[in-house]
A protein has these predicted regions:
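Short, well-structured alpha-helical segments
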Residues: 52, 56, 87, 155-163
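Acidic, glycine- and histidine-enriched catalytic cores of nucleic acid- and nucleotide-handling enzymes
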Residues: 1-51
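A conserved active-site cap/scaffold subdomain adjacent to cofactor or substrate pockets
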Residues: 87-89, 96-97, 126-131
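C-terminal subdomains that position terminal phosphate/3'-OH groups for nucleotidyl transfer/ligation
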Residues: 101-195
């Protein structure tokens, strides 16, 4: 096996690293920025510091990527075991600027913890997306989902969860410490979980 870029060593170290110059890789296709976080989340790997720095610096290049491609990577990221740890504020600020992840870091950190509390199954990706968009409320979530070109079915499911949870910026600021209690019923299929 010929391994000119040290991939086997990175696998052994549980590290995701761009091949060659990360800036160049991300300039070739900015969607690789989201893929970096998706693969790291999927396998629970760390991100090489230089690769992570390049991803954050070149995050604005995601504006040139189609909404459909961004949506696909975001949904795959949300299907990972603990995606909250890999939702990079500088990147998400480009993909979903209305969340203001860099302006409100405490709120964003609580959102990430809430997302991680929802069981990681394909069926729960809409619940995780609803948790991510919760500060926007139902109307804001619908607008964000349309911008990402999500299907009508996914948009309806996520906004129904938003409506049931009573999402919105004001309610989040008043009760952000209760995010885990909201995630528990969502993780149980919106049934009242056993006490």
């Amino acid at each position: 096996l010929i391994d000119p870029f040290g991939g086997r060593d990175d696998l052994a170290a549980h590290l995701v690293r761009a091949v060659g110059e990360p800036e160049r890789r991300f300039e070739e296709d900015a969607l690789r920025i989201l893929r970096l976080y998706r693969f790291a989340a999927r396998f629970g790997f760390a991100i090489d510091p230089a690769t992570g720095a390049a991803a954050r610096a070149l995050g604005p290049h995601l504006d040139c990527v189609s909404a459909e491609r961004i949506q696909e990577e975001l949904l795959k990221l949300l299907a990972a075991p603990r995606p909250g740890s890999y939702l990079e504020p500088a990147v998400l600020a480009v993909v979903l600027p209305e969340l203001e992840p860099e302006e409100q870091p405490e709120r964003f950190a609580e959102l990430c913890r809430t997302i991680d509390r929802i069981e990681p199954t394909a069926e729960n990706v809409p619940a995780r997306l609803a948790a991510l968009l919760w500060p926007l409320g139902e109307a804001g979530a619908r607008k964000a989902l349309r911008k990402l070109k999500c299907s009508n079915a996914l948009t309806d499911e996520v906004t129904a969860l938003e409506r049931e949870a009573g999402g919105g910026a004001g309610s989040f600021l008043l009760g952000h410490e209760s995010g885990h209690s909201i995630a528990r019923p969502i993780a149980c299929g919106n049934r009242v979980p056993p006490q």
